[in-house]
Structure formats: structure tokens, C-alpha cells
């Protein structure tokens, strides 16, 4: 399946990459990117890999999430032959707030 990154998800990924690069250096940044792209490849082969995201259960489509590492997860939904990555969450933050931000960003 093909992977489509929504602009907000790509923006959040870039923010995380920038933070890791600044705070922890190139080696840590490369390791994180390797984990993120590995997760993306796994999703392409196994679209239902992630469980249904409970904080988005009332949404009009079935959102799923998959953990990239212990601090981040990808939020996505399956649209025909495409996996639509709609957000990139920090697992340390309030999940209800992130869910609302995801819904709000999809409305605009």
C-alpha cells in the first residue's frame, strides 16, 4: 500500500526531528528517523498493524495508531489502497488534547 503523509503529520515529524537533532545530535536523530521509516514500511505491508485509536473512536473514520518508539506514535486511517498518516503524537502529552487537535486540523 502507498503511504500519504498529511501536512500536519509531516510538520510534527519535522519538529520532533529538529528537536532530537538540536538536543541529542546527529546519531540520535538518525536512529529516530530509522525507527520512523521502519514503522512506515511495516504499515505499508500490514495496514491493520496498529489498533484502533481509542481517543478517536467516535470519529467518522476508523483511526488507528502505531508506536514508533516509546515517545511517539503515528495516527493513521486506511483509505482504499492508501494509508493516510494524519498525525504524529507525542505519547507523553495528554491524549484527549492531541485527539482534539487532530480532529481540528482535519476540519481545516
Label each residue range with its predicted role.
Residues 68-108:
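Enriched for short, Lys/Arg-rich terminal
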Residues 2-63, 105-108:
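Basic, Lys/Arg-enriched alpha-helical interface segments
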Amino acid at each position: 500500500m502507498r503511504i500519504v503523509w498529511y501536512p500536519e503529520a509531516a510538520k510534527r515529524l519535522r519538529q520532533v526531528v529538529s528537536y532530537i537533532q538540536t538536543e541529542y545530535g546527529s546519531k540520535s536523530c538518525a536512529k529516530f528517523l530509522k525507527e520512523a521509516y521502519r514503522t512506515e514500511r511495516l504499515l505499508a505491508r500490514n495496514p491493520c498493524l496498529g489498533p484502533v485509536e481509542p481517543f478517536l473512536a467516535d470519529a467518522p473514520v476508523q483511526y488507528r495508531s502505531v508506536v514508533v518508539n516509546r515517545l511517539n506514535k503515528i495516527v493513521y486511517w486506511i483509505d482504499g489502497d492508501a494509508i493516510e498518516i494524519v498525525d504524529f503524537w507525542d505519547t507523553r502529552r495528554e491524549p484527549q488534547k492531541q485527539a482534539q487537535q487532530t480532529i481540528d486540523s482535519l476540519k481545516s
